[in-house]
Amino acid sequence: MQVFPPPQVPLLGAHTSTSGGLQNAIYEGQEIGASTVQMFTANQRQWRRRPLTDDLINSFKTALEETSLSYIMSHAGYLINPGAPNPEILEKSRICIQQEIQDCLSLGITFVNFHPGAAVNDTKEACLDRIVSSFSLVEPLFEDSPPLVVLFETTAGQGTLVGSTFEELGYLIDKLKHKIPVGVCIDTCHIFASGYDITSPGSWKQVLKNFDDAIGLSYLRAFHLNDSMFPLGKHKDRHAPLGEGDIGMESFKFLMTDELTRMIPKYLETPGGPDLWTKEIRQLKSFQK
């Protein structure tokens, strides 16, 4: 079981488009001034995946070589619910998890990011245990495999979603860390929506302490950078451009400059597309000068 070490330089990017081929997400990253990107490796709203061909894999790896982008993150599909109480949904989710991981290994991707799951009409405790079981099934894929880290993304706490507290994510990490390479991706909008105040350096330091106590900072492997259209603790997952929401730009300046967070890869998911991301990347980089 191999794990990529943390990067030696700050990495910043956005969720770019795979329209016309997976490699185009990499080239779009270069165009917006990114050093990394997040992408979908398959249609995020369908159960079925198109099989990877050798040509597609080679085109993707060529794009990585030509651009020098690294620590690429794949965002798994939205239909996947590893903790589903419905047996049919659970089985489909487990098949998709295996296929997603296999494709990421073939492509040489560093991170594969999953929404933890939803309890639906069951308890969160039972949901968490099913998530552990779902990801335990892929342990054989990581024997003698290229490095790949499974990330669980923080959620906004809406509905029956699990993963809105560090304690819930800590439970998953603790149960899985000796089986597969695992970590956490903090979405700034999501944790703000779930009640974690990150509007100032002081509040961020407290949140990072809480994370360390519940999970361990070594498992914080990535950030999704998003401002929030709604106030603290409203459990609304609505992204806003950086500095134009209720979180504020001071929060993102902290992440770019603090010793604990500056080297952790960061991926923009703000609404606005490539033109906005180019500006946001330029502004975020300016904080480190």
Swiss-Prot record:
It is an enzyme of class 3 (hydrolase). Zn(2+) 1 binds at H75, H115, E153. Zn(2+) 2 binds at E153, D187, H224, E269. SUPFAM superfamilies: Xylose isomerase-like. Binds 3 Zn(2+) ions. Its cofactor is Zn(2+). GO terms for molecular function: deoxyribonuclease IV (phage-T4-induced) activity; DNA binding; DNA-(apurinic or apyrimidinic site) endonuclease activity; phosphoric diester hydrolase activity; zinc ion binding. The keyword S-adenosyl-L-methionine does not apply. Keywords: DNA damage, DNA repair, Endonuclease, Hydrolase, Metal-binding, Nuclease, Zinc. NCBIfam families: nfo, PRK01060.1-2. This is Probable endonuclease 4. It comes from Chlamydia abortus (strain DSM 27085 / S26/3).
